[in-house]
């Protein structure tokens, strides 16, 4: 079936979203045009405004409309001298949801991946190095993903911290709460055994 050029453009644009293939894009486009044109216009307006006005925090690199985000400007967040290094702004939301952390963050917007041509300056480690040199950070909590690239990135940052005499710690990895031991993969179980603590 031949569709209009504009409809094709809409479906192609929707496919830029993660997990949206041709069928899903077609379904979304038809829904917006057939049942929710007002919602479609709101979506278009919000997307347009967000793409032009949301940038990166000058301190932590998370998304914000301001020069410096609300977390970095909060004096209470600066008291303990901690920063938690994460790979994406979505990771900040996950850490914040725990209610267990009250420091500042640094967002890498990725991880080291030499095979893909992603080096230290591509993920802002030059900015992190500058922040460590300023002397207002006493501990860096490494909360990168437990992947090969995430571990390599954490190791690189730990070395940076050593150069600046700043304590570096890694979040624990292990058996999920409610998980069954026999179903846990070997790497996760190894991390759990190595990261055990006294009770």
Curated annotation (Swiss-Prot):
InterPro entries named in the record: DNA_Rcmb_RecR, Rcmb_RecR, Rcmb_RecR_Znf, TOPRIM_dom, TOPRIM_RecR
Any one GO BP annotation for this protein: DNA recombination
UniProt keyword DNA damage, yes or no: yes
SMART domains: TOPRIM (SM00493)
Gene Ontology molecular functions: DNA binding; zinc ion binding
Zinc fingers typed C4-type, residue spans: 57-72
Residue stretches making up the Toprim domain: 81-176
Entry keyword set: DNA damage, DNA recombination, DNA repair, Metal-binding, Zinc, Zinc-finger
Superkingdom: Bacteria
Alphabetized HAMAP family for the sequence: RecR
Protein's job: May play a role in DNA repair. It seems to be involved in an RecBC-independent recombinational process of DNA repair. It may act with RecF and RecO.
Name under which the protein is recorded: Recombination protein RecR
Species, as recorded: Vibrio parahaemolyticus serotype O3:K6 (strain RIMD 2210633)
């Amino acid at each position: 079936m031949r569709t209009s050029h504009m409809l094709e453009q809409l479906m192609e644009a929707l496919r830029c979203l993660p997990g949206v293939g041709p069928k899903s894009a077609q379904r979304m486009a038809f829904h917006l045009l057939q049942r929710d044109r007002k919602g479609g216009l709101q979506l278009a307006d919000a997307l347009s405004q967000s793409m032009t006005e949301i940038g990166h925090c000058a301190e932590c690199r998370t998304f914000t409309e301001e020069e410096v985000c609300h977390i970095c400007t909060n004096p209470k967040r600066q008291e303990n001298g901690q920063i938690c290094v994460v790979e994406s702004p979505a990771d900040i939301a996950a850490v914040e949801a725990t209610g267990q952390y009250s420091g500042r963050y640094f967002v890498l917007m990725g991880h080291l991946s030499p095979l893909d041509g992603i080096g230290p300056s591509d993920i802002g480690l030059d900015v992190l190095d500058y922040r460590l040199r300023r002397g207002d950070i006493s501990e860096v909590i490494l909360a990168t993903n437990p992947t090969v690239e995430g571990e390599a990135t954490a190791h690189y940052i730990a070395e940076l911290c050593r150069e600046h005499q700043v304590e570096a710690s890694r979040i624990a990895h292990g058996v999920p709460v409610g998980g069954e031991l026999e179903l846990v993969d070997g790497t996760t179980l190894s991390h759990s055994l190595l990261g055990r603590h006294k009770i």
